Amino acid sequence: MLSYWEKSEMLEHDLIVIGGGITGMFCALCYRELYPKARIAVLERGLFPSGASTKNAGFACFGSLTELMDDSFNMDQESMLNILELRVKGLALLRKTLGDKIMDYKAHGGYELFFEKQPKALDMISHFNALLQPLFKADVYRTSPSKIKAFGFDNRKVTHLIENAFEAQINTGKMIQGLRSKLNQKDIFFFSNTEVTQLDTDQKKVVTKSNGENLSFRFKKLALCNNAFVKQFFNDLEVDPW
């Protein structure tokens, strides 16, 4: 049974964010900047973020050459460049918010290996470098044959290596820990192991399950930041995360 203080101080919020990954925590931090006195809570169903925030390999990337080639087949050029720019700005915001040391950011570059004798990507380097020149003010992609052996690959199998000097690596565990620390500094609640089982936008409440107990949180505003899992609450939405 909850106490009066638990009900009044922990269950009623101006903003509730569903999803405790990168998107959810940044949403909460940005809202705090706009509304310094707001009561904000982040609800995460897992002990750790359930999405990709800590499950990727630590890539601080915006797109290899072949990824951009694939994107160009699936969308128009303007859309592709807009998405790429958002990725680049997102990485810049992450670095500005946490600092490189906190998340162990290392600018080692990004590398793509090829096994064909003459992959199509080689012919597209100059094309995409020209497209990205306004954003980076330099060539993004280049061939680096000397690094095939330097990295320990068999050059009889790996025929080409294309380097992206603007990509890097991060420690996603340290990154998430850093963001959690930011939430604490900004007086934002974070509830882990708290799965939202019911969402009622009319009554402005979410029902959660934590340690076998059902709890109702009330909100004035709600942000769904669980990306691919948003269909859990709105089945009719066509959500295709990139």
Task: Name the predicted role of every residue range.
Residues 1-15, 33-34, 38-39:
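Extreme N-terminal leader/targeting segments of oxidoreductases
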Residues 19-25, 45:
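Glycine-rich Rossmann-fold phosphate-binding loop(s) that bind the pyrophosphate
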Residues 32-55:
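Glycine-rich FAD pyrophosphate-binding loop
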Residues 51-85:
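Glycine-rich active-site loop/strand segments that organize a redox cofactor
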Residues 57-60, 65, 110-113, 237-242:
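Central beta-strand plus flanking loop segment that forms part of the substrate or channel wall
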Residues 66-72, 96-181:
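Flavin (FAD/FMN) cofactor-binding and adjacent substrate-gating region
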Residues 155-219:
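Helical element adjacent to the flavin cofactor pocket in flavoenzyme catalytic cores
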